[in-house]
């Protein structure tokens, strides 16, 4: 009985020892694999180029270069006033952001101050081109206005074609003429006085504003 118990205990201890050895070998193997993975990661990290991701500057620069090649912007840097505008503003400099400073310094050699002007110039509404009506056109428009203060639809289309004008030009002229008619009537002047090109230009500015 005692011998049997001793043999079983010896066998069990040998199994436990073998299992411990196997587990230790597995742990050692896993540790070696982890070390190899760490070395590979370090090597790949050293060899990997830094410019894998695009910064905001990288994305913005091509658009700036394309805009600078626009012939309509080429006169900005040569006007002479651009340099003065670039150095004004709060704190003595308008280039308060680091990326703007980087953009300016990088592109200044190639594009001058044109690049800076792209960021600093405020958005402006396109100025409406003044229509210079001829004397005969003004006479015909005044006659049409005497007959009807509101010319719309086919009547406006026919009048524009007759005077070699666009419908928009006729529409704006009638708007300005009605404005003058109301104004002179309030002032006690002659509301039927014809409107000159200068008066048309002034009323046009008021209607646009």
Curated annotation (Swiss-Prot):
Q: Is Cell inner membrane one of the keywords UniProt gives this record?
A: no
Extract the GO molecular function terms from the UniProt entry. Answer: DNA-binding transcription factor activity, RNA polymerase II-specific; RNA polymerase II cis-regulatory region sequence-specific DNA binding
Check the record and name the InterPro entries matching this protein. Answer: EMX-VAX-Noto_Homeobox_TFs, HD, HD_metazoa, Homeobox_CS, Homeodomain-like_sf, HTH_motif
Q: Give the UniProt subcellular location, in the record's own words.
A: Nucleus
- Which top-rank group of organisms is this from? Eukaryota
The record's listing under CDD domains reads: homeodomain (cd00086)
Q: Which stretches are tagged as biased composition: Acidic residues? A: 15-24
Q: Which Pfam families match?
A: Homeodomain (PF00046)
Kindly state a single biological-process term from the GO annotations of this entry: neuron differentiation
- Keywords for this entry? DNA-binding, Homeobox, Nucleus
Phenotype upon loss of function: Mutants lacking the homeobox domain are viable and fertile but proliferate slightly more slowly than wild-type due to retarded larval development and reduced brood size. About 20% appear starved as they are shorter, thinner and paler at all stages with severely affected adults bearing only a few eggs. M3 neuron activity is decreased.
Whereabouts does the entry annotate DNA binding, in residue ranges? 126-185
Q: Where is this region: Disordered?
A: 1-46, 181-209
Primary role: Required for activity of the M3 pharyngeal motor neuron.
Alphabetical list of PANTHER family matching this protein: E5-RELATED, HOMEOBOX PROTEIN EMX-RELATED
**What is this protein's record name?**
Homeobox protein ceh-2
